[in-house]
Structure formats: structure tokens, C-alpha cells
């Protein structure tokens, strides 16, 4: 397995990461409910092949993915680089409506208090006292970038996160976060040979800021694994 630094940090991550959307269960995350044993087997395979980068999010199964990972990581937390997300929550404490699913209303809130509460909730669900990386799940233009950056920097100083990034964003968002004093280590965007999106523009900005461009959907949900 090849490794690289996560942006400007000293964090070594495998160039392949494990996304744990499928652990969430429910109506959309996968076709079955996962167990702790499923999560443990995933981590075993990752370890076997040298994958140390694990990605999840609070809304994957409305907390389920994080909880299963937390239990599966007991006794082996230091073997993996753990990345989760903030901004999407189901606490009904404000923010912008994002979606309704499985009886929950999910809002998008990038204000300081919401970001910090998201991190505290993730730490609790996963049974750890720090996160290696936290990603703003959906960049939101309704709230000041400076406020979000300030909250993320506070969390770094407090030792609760090591670094942070963006997802579902535009190249202009990366520039705005950097100009607001942010230190964006990673951007996570949908990208494939069928859906190049704004990859080229993002690639140039990532080079400028030494930010890792992390992709999801590269196999188009399995379509690109079949003969053409």
C-alpha cells in the first residue's frame, strides 16, 4: 500500500480509504443491517492490505455507522486514521433543512456551536477522545466561513481533532476557507471518469494549498466494475 501525508500535517494515510456508508443500515445506506462483527471484519481486511484510513459520518444510519466503528475499534484505535464529518445533524436545533429519512429531519448547520456539538457527539459514539480528521459534510453559504473556521481551529487546539477538511463543496469554498485562516488538509468530492465535475479546477487549487483531493463514487456505484 502507498501512503501520503494528509495535506500539511504529519499524518500518514493510505492512498485508499475505507468508506463506511454501508454500515449505516436503514432505508438508504445499505440493503441490510450491519453488526459489530461486520465492522470488525472490514477493519481486519483493511489491516491485512495496509489500509489505515477510515471514513464515516454521523448521518450514515443516523449514528449507527459511527457506533459500530467505535465498538470495532476497541483495542486497535491507534492502528487507524479515523475521519468523520460535521454539519449534518438531526438535533432540531436550527440550521438549514437538508432531508427527511427514517423518521429523522436532518439539518445542515456550520455555525460554531453546531460544529463543536457534532464533534462531541461523534467522540461519544465512537468511544474515542480524539478524531484524526473532521470534514464539513456539506459546505453551507448561509453562515460565516470565519465562524466555522474558528470552531475547527478551537477543536484542534483542544486536541479533539488533528485536522479538518471540506466535502460537497466548490473550488471557491476551498479558497474562502483558506483565506479565512483555515488549514484545509483534504477535500472529499464525487469524481469519476464519467462525472469529472470540477476536478481540474480543484486539482490546481489543491496543489496551491497542499490539500489532498479525496474522491468518492469513483466506480459509479459498481457500474465501472463491469465490462463496457
What kind of region is each of these model predictions?
Residues 32-46, 108-126, 170-175:
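Short, acidic/polar
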Residues 51, 128-131, 161, 184:
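A structural motif
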Residues 123-142:
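Active-site groove signature of glycoside hydrolases
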Residues 12-14, 22-28, 92-104, 205-228:
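Glycine-rich, positively charged active-site loop/lid region within alpha/beta enzyme cores that binds
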Residues 1-81:
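N-terminal binding-site loop/beta-alpha segment at the start of enzyme catalytic domains
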Residues 6, 18, 46, 54, ...:
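Conserved, mostly hydrophobic/aromatic
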Residues 79-91:
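A short, structured active-site edge motif that brings together acidic residues
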Residues 3, 139-228:
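Beta/alpha (TIM)-barrel catalytic core signal, keyed to glycine-rich beta->alpha loops juxtaposed to Asp/Glu
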